[in-house]
Amino acid sequence: MDRVEALKQKAFEVKGFDGFLVTSEVNLYYFTGCPGLTSMLIPKTGKGIIYAYNVNYEQAKYMTKGFELEMLERGQNLMAAVAKQAKACKIKKLAFDTLNFESYRQLAKELRGQARLKPKGDLVGELRRVKDPKELQLMRKAAELTNTGMKIAYETIKPGMKEYQVAAEIEYAMRKRGSWGVAFDTIIASGARSAFPHGGGGTQLGGGCTNREIRNGELVVVDMGAVYEHYRSDITRTIVAGKPQTKQTELYEIVRASHDEALKAIRPGAKAKDVDSTARKVIADAGYGEYFVHGLGHGVGLEVHEGPTLSSLSKDNLTIGNVVTDEPGIYLLGFGGVRIEDTVLVHKGNAECLTSGPYNLEANC
């Protein structure tokens, strides 16, 4: 409930709204501690009203406290139910975190002009990006499991292994030790595929690892993370199956230096774009600036990509309690890529790497 009160303070007292509609499943979990909910309407006065379809109603009743609960039947119009309650609460300025076009259109129609709608998901994002002690405890556990997975990667990668076999060993090791799942589709990108930052895969289609056989002397980018009580971690290492070539070692040392310089720059009050610039300068000075093709990092928490963002376009400033990634890389088409990534906690005066897997370039084969 403290989180709901914090949102009320931001949305109602500071911004002047008198209602807030939460529809993102992740945001709903953040505020209620219950997965599988549909929506929650928070009026300026009184309790928040949670909407759950009948399939999840008993779960919601069991897992939530301090809220009113309304069950929706299959096929019932959610936006009509929300609008009815908003009118009953005399809400005139209704903020929301996210709505697709059709839901927005339906809600506006049902409200009949009695309340103005405005997207304000950034207010929830501002709360979520500062982790409290309980969240940090869970993220430390997720990072611990992730570190275990990366150690397995170093022990598993060898010539003749298939990419999906390496992923399976990593994921099994993390699951066996308590991971609730994987933070995202594990990326095992070997050979020329390592020059693609996501291993040639897609967010929804997957494909971060394939049936390709790892060959002796190839670069292998391993990007993976564990989940613990819905909180995630993220780590990347670049590993050679065999003895590294001179060029591979050169690229690795440049990326490692970029990673380490960025880590020094991650501190409370730092501009996120300046941290990105610090990492980017190291790579540019070495002659590979055009091959660092993405931002330095992103926030991690209930989602593997959330605020704040570390890039040249970011307007974010870092603050105590932020958890972000530090992941510079160099990607040479036809040769391969190198990336090193850690999940980092912003502390008072410094930064702490939550992930701490090996930093060796050579596999333990």
Task: Write out the residue ranges for each language-model feature.
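Active-site neighborhoods and metal-handling regions in enzymes and metal-associated proteins
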Residues: 1-365
